[in-house]
Amino acid sequence: MKEQKERKLRGNIALIAHDGKKADMVKFVMDHRDILGEYQLHATGTTGQKIAETGLKNIIRYNSGPYGGDAEIGTLVAKGEVDMVFFFRDPLGKHPHDPDIATLMRLCDVWEVPLATNKSTARLLLRNFPKNE
């Protein structure tokens, strides 16, 4: 495998949440809307809809996870179009799209894109990750 080149930050964050974590994601977004408002947000279907209902306008929605949304976000990761991924997942649940989830997580590792799977990690990334102007 080739050595990865340094990626230019684009100011894009992907947001994904399993059903049992959507309320946590919405609360996280509301608690950090001053910072998140400076980024272009990309979200899977229902997660994006719930975030948009809070009044944030800087969000692009993709399909819901089971309908290919996780794979769409994975494509953004592979193309270098996302700086970090916040995926609040339910680690105890089974999901019909588990292969897509595993692929997304693998792509984050391959392309060295920071991946937060819980609020604490997302908070650390958001506060300590520089955004190119």
PLM region spans:
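SAM-dependent methyltransferases
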Residues: M1-A14, K27, R33-E38, E53-K57, ...
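Short, glycine-rich nucleotide/cofactor-binding loops
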Residues: I13-K22
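Short internal beta-strands
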Residues: E38-T47, I51
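Short hydrophobic/aromatic-enriched beta-strand-loop microsegments
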Residues: Q40, K57-G68
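General beta-strand structural signal in soluble alpha/beta enzymes
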Residues: H42-T44, R61-N63, F87, L115-K119
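Mid-chain, well-packed structural core segment of small domains
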Residues: Y67-M105
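Ser/Thr/Gly-rich flexible loops in soluble cytosolic domains mediating phosphotransfer, phosphorylation
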Residues: G93, I101-N132
